Design a protein with these regions (language model features):
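A structured beta-alpha segment of the ubiquitous adenosine-cofactor-binding alpha/beta core
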Residues: 11-28, 35-36, 183-213
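Generic hydrophobic/aromatic pocket-lining and core-packing "Φ" positions
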Residues: 6, 41, 63, 103, ...
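Glycine/serine-rich phosphate-binding loop and adjoining beta1-alpha1 elements at the start
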Residues: 38, 42-128
Length: 215
């Protein structure tokens, strides 16, 4: 729900239609956050265009069926992350929100104080947070947790993320003898079995002193 009222749409010349079936069967272009229900998908006709966030790997069969019916489907999370497409990069914006929300939700369910509190009766230590993965969502989680007074640790297979984590006040956990597992496009690549074992050992030791894990 976008939070816009019907009158706001009417003011810019939009026609309000209450019958969902009419909209789906008559529209040439349909913008939808998630994939339509199975019943509504049956209402679509050839040469219509669907634009939205459709989780194509999960909904592969449904999308293939739409393609067979000559329906165009544009799943925005599959847009290439290139300069020309930056204004339509929904992954970064949604990942930012996901990182922020993960911290807020976890802190709301945490039964202790987040920042360190010093009183005459004693000191309450700050909560320790581990963020696994320092991509867009991870960096936002680190920044949010740090602003709220937590002690933040983070790990990532891409060594270039170390500087980003530390710039936000986080402590970067480095695997001994680690290599930079980053592709030319900035994504993480497959790690060796030896690296994975070292990473597991590092996390196993770290988790013993962590209050909240975000991954």
């Amino acid at each position: 729900h976008l939070g816009f009222k019907d009158n706001e749409y009417k003011e810019v010349g939009v026609e309000i239609c209450k019958n969902e079936a009419d909209i789906l069967s008559k529209a040439d272009i349909i913008v939808q956050l998630g994939l339509l229900s199975d019943d509504n998908l049956l209402l679509l006709k050839a040469k219509q265009t669907l634009v939205g966030v459709f989780n194509p790997y999960i909904n592969k069969e449904k999308i293939e069926n739409l393609s067979k019916k000559n329906i165009n489907v544009f799943s925005l999370e599959m847009l290439p992350r290139i300069t020309r497409a930056q204004s339509m990069d929904i992954l970064s914006s949604q990942a930012n929100l996901a990182g922020y929300k993960a911290v807020i939700e976890s802190f709301a369910n945490f039964e202790k104080a987040i920042p360190m509190m010093m009183t005459a009766a004693g000191t309450i230590p700050a909560a320790k947070v581990l963020v696994v993965g320092a991509g867009v969502a991870g960096l936002q989680a680190i920044a949010t947790a740090k602003r709220m007074g937590a002690i933040v640790f983070a790990t990532d297979v891409r060594m270039t993320s170390k500087e980003q984590v530390e710039s936000l006040g986080g402590k970067f956990l480095t695997v001994e003898g680690s290599e930079n597992l980053e592709t030319e496009g900035g994504y993480a690549k497959e790690a060796s079995a030896e690296f994975k074992k070292k990473q597991e050992d590092l996390l196993s030791e770290t988790l013993k002193k962590i209050d909240i894990v975000i991954c």
